[in-house]
């Protein structure tokens, strides 16, 4: 069985819902479908929550009424049978009455998660009703019955697997199994959500749990590209990526995929395909354990980086010095992206400057501290094992006219990173594309 995940834009209108239905039933084989809320709905639900936090029930009710009117129009556009329209209207009436009930109660973060969850609950019910109207044997599985996080707010794969198995057995023979893509319960049974990776993560976890043949992530983009099309003048789709290459690109700025979401698929050895609902026949990108030896796949960039350098000839070589430095960053929950050391100094980069002042003050105990802001990490991704000669020279040649603050290689065989000024980002990405992909 394949798992197919569709984001908010893919189910953003009644017409898109109809087209998604055609896509998932095209093969005639059973599929497990994961849906997000209709585009714009989650923002409205967050707006409702904001009003309630501010003790403004009138503002919340205004947004609820506006959202209800929007969905009333969707019902008329989506369904052809009066019976289905009536049943869906009744369902929506209950959902919006539920939202209004929060305007009369004490409001906390727990209630906010329940409110935000309604977006996916509404979209999945609307789509499953449409499928049934079309004569499709579709079953709606409530994600709150099997998706759970543990006490560390991390997904609980064993629980998901154990809960899903009997649920699927009870509904054996269905053509489409449909569920929500963001919501879950926490270890205490409360409504919660998968904060990192959202519905992509859910699709990957479900794929692992049911030993899926393939996990498909459908968006409005033709998979991964070899550079950022918003910055450079030419890009091409990347048709094949190793799991590690995809993780590097996701971490360093490729917005199409969250770095955590492919981990379950990687561990289970299940291919992930990135496909485009607007162009379903496009090849897209396949992510798997396959390596294309010695090939550079793509370039990505990460903005809003801060570089920190500690210079201390007295302390650097002292036992435990680096441990003390790392403990400072850990105490402020600030991750280090890049690190380089020498006999008299250590340079690091971070992407979270929320506690920069406190971190710098503590680092000054150990030496002279220099901070550079408005930096950018540019990374070249591919099969870059040290035995593959020449990729370093190629990248450095492309950056020969651009000041490079740091270079990082060796922590991964799939990435070489350069820290540059943000103002040089466009030129760096363009030069790397010209040199590596288009031989200009």
Where are these regions (language model features)?
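Glycine-rich beta-alpha junction loops
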Residues: 37-39, 221-223, 276-281, 291, ...
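Flexible loop/turn segments at secondary-structure boundaries
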Residues: 11, 41-42, 148, 185-187, ...
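A conserved regulatory-domain signal marking ACT and ACT-like small-molecule sensing domains
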Residues: 283-440
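A conserved active-site cap/scaffold subdomain adjacent to cofactor or substrate pockets
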Residues: 242-288, 292-314
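Nucleotide/pyrophosphate-binding catalytic subdomain
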Residues: 1-257, 262, 421
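Structured core elements
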Residues: 3, 10, 32-33, 177-179, ...
């Amino acid at each position: 069985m394949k798992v197919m995940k569709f984001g908010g834009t893919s189910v953003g209108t009644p017409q898109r819902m109809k087209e998604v239905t055609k896509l998932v039933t095209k093969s005639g084989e059973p599929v497990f479908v994961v849906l997000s809320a209709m585009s714009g709905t989650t923002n409205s639900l967050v707006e409702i929550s904001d009003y309630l936090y501010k003790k403004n029930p009138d503002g919340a009710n205004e947004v609820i009424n506006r959202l209800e009117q929007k969905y009333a129009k969707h019902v008329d556009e989506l369904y052809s049978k009066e019976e289905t329209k009536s049943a869906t209207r009744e369902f929506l009436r209950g959902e919006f009455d539920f939202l209004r009930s929060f305007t009369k109660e004490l409001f906390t973060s727990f209630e906010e998660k329940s409110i935000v969850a309604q977006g996916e609950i509404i979209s999945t019910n609307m789509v499953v009703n449409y499928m049934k109207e079309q004569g499709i044997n579709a079953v709606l599985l409530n994600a709150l019955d099997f998706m759970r996080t543990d006490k560390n707010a991390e997904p609980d794969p064993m629980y998901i697997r154990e809960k899903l198995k009997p649920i699927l057995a009870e509904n054996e023979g269905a053509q489409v199994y449909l569920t929500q893509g963001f919501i879950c319960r926490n270890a205490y049974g409360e409504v919660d959500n998968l904060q990192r990776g959202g519905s992509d993560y859910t699709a990957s976890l479900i794929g692992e749990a049911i030993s899926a043949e393939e996990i498909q992530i459908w968006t409005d983009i033709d998979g991964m590209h070899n550079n950022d099309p918003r910055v450079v003048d030419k890009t091409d789709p990347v048709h094949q990526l190793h799991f590690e290459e995809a993780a590097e690109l996701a971490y360093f700025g490729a917005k199409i995929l969250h770095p955590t979401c492919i981990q379950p698929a990687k561990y289970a050895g299940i291919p992930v395909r990135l496909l485009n609902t607007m162009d379903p026949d496009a090849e897209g990108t396949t992510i798997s354990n396959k390596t294309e030896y010695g090939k550079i796949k793509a370039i990505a960039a990460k903005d809003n980086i801060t570089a920190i350098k500690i210079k201390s000839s007295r302390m650097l070589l002292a036992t435990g010095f680096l441990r003390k430095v790392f403990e400072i960053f850990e105490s402020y929950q600030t991750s280090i992206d890049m690190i380089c050391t020498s006999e008299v100094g250590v340079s690091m980069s971070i992407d979270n400057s929320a506690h920069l002042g406190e971190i710098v003050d503590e680092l000054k105990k150990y030496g002279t501290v220099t901070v550079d802001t408005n930096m950018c990490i540019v990374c070249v991704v591919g099969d870059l094992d040290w035995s593959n000669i020449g990729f370093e020279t190629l990248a450095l040649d492309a950056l020969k006219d651009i000041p490079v603050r740091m270079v990082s290689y060796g922590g991964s065989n799939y990435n070489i990173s350069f820290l540059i000024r943000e103002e040089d980002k466009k030129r760096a990405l363009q030069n790397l594309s010209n040199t590596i992909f288009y031989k200009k």
